[in-house]
């Protein structure tokens, strides 16, 4: 042990490194640090609240969005599903959490999944383009129940394969997807969208109202603008960085496979 000689009140004390460590530890406050004030609506610290970007009056489309959310998504600090829920009237965006659906705890979900107007937004092999559907009100089309899987791509895929009830739903996919406007976050590939962007774009197609998308993206624009003004930088997708040979990390087999499936640029 290393010994240290400390003089206190004209007396010399011999202290080992362990003694010093315990003395320093005793100076640490037992009380937890004060938490930052949080917004009562979005639950984020007030300084980084994105609620000013929400519509002044919550939107009330005829269709509704059903989010099947992986439990791990709740821990993500920059998740966008709450933006979707807070931008729509109560009952127009319902969230169920789990890794398999439906379960007994998911009250009312089984009935929704059995509804003939319920559709799933998921790129399964037989999925058709969402814009091929009649918008609400066209040819007597009733309001849709739009099911979204919320999580990383591996998590969403796991939810789908663990939930046989989802196999029975009509599956659709977005085509001609615009670039993500979530510019402070790195997306896996070009064409990947956040949950908010996916829901907003899909809902605007089903409702036949393109203005819905612009209004619903308000909180995302507000968040990105704030972060960029305070030191954040614009992110490109992993796919873009890899193609430009500027991605700083080795890529995994899953992403490499996805990139091989993409069409070559002319």
Feature map (PLM): residue ranges:
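Short Cys/His-rich Zn2+-coordinating modules
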Residues: 16-33
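S-adenosyl-L-methionine/SAH cofactor-binding core of RNA-modifying enzymes
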Residues: 89-161, 165
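Histidine-anchored nucleotide/phosphate-binding helix
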Residues: 52, 76-87
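C-terminal folded domains that constitute the principal catalytic or ligand-binding module
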Residues: 145, 153-266
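Short metal-coordination and nucleic-acid-contact micro-motifs, chiefly zinc-binding Cys/His arrays
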Residues: 35, 45, 61
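Short cysteine-rich clusters marking metal-coordination/redox-active sites
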Residues: 39-42
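N-terminal amphipathic/basic-hydrophobic helices that include classical n-h-c signal peptides
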Residues: 1-14
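Short Cys/His-rich local motifs and their 1-3 flanking residues in nucleic-acid-associated proteins
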Residues: 44-47, 51
């Amino acid at each position: 042990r290393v010994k240290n000689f400390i003089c206190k009140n004209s007396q010399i004390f011999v202290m080992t490194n362990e003694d010093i460590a315990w003395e320093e530890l005793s100076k640490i406050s037992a009380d937890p640090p004060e938490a930052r004030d949080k917004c009562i609506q979005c639950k984020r610290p007030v300084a980084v609240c994105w609620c000013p970007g929400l519509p002044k009056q919550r939107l009330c489309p005829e269709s509704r969005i059903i989010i099947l959310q992986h439990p791990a998504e709740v821990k993500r600090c920059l998740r966008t599903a709450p933006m979707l829920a807070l931008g729509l009237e109560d009952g127009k965006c319902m969230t169920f959490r789990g890794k398999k659906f439906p379960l007994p705890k998911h009250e009312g979900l089984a009935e929704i999944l059995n509804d003939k107007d319920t559709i799933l937004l998921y790129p399964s092999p037989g999925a058709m383009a969402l814009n091929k559907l009649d918008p609400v009100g066209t040819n007597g089309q009733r309001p849709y129940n739009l099911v979204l899987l919320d999580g990383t791509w591996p998590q969403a895929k796991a939810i789908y394969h663990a939930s046989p009830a989802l196999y029975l739903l009509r599956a659709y996919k977005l085509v001609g997807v615009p670039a993500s406007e979530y510019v402070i976050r790195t997306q896996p590939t070009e064409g990947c969208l956040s949950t908010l962007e996916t829901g907003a774009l899909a809902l605007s197609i089903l409702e036949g109202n393109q203005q819905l998308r612009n209004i619903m993206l308000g909180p995302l624009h507000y968040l990105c603008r704030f972060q960029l003004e305070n030191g954040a930088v614009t992110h490109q997708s992993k796919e873009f960085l890899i193609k430009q040979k500027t991605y700083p990390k080795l890529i995994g087999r899953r992403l490499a496979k996805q990139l091989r499936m993409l069409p070559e640029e002319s």
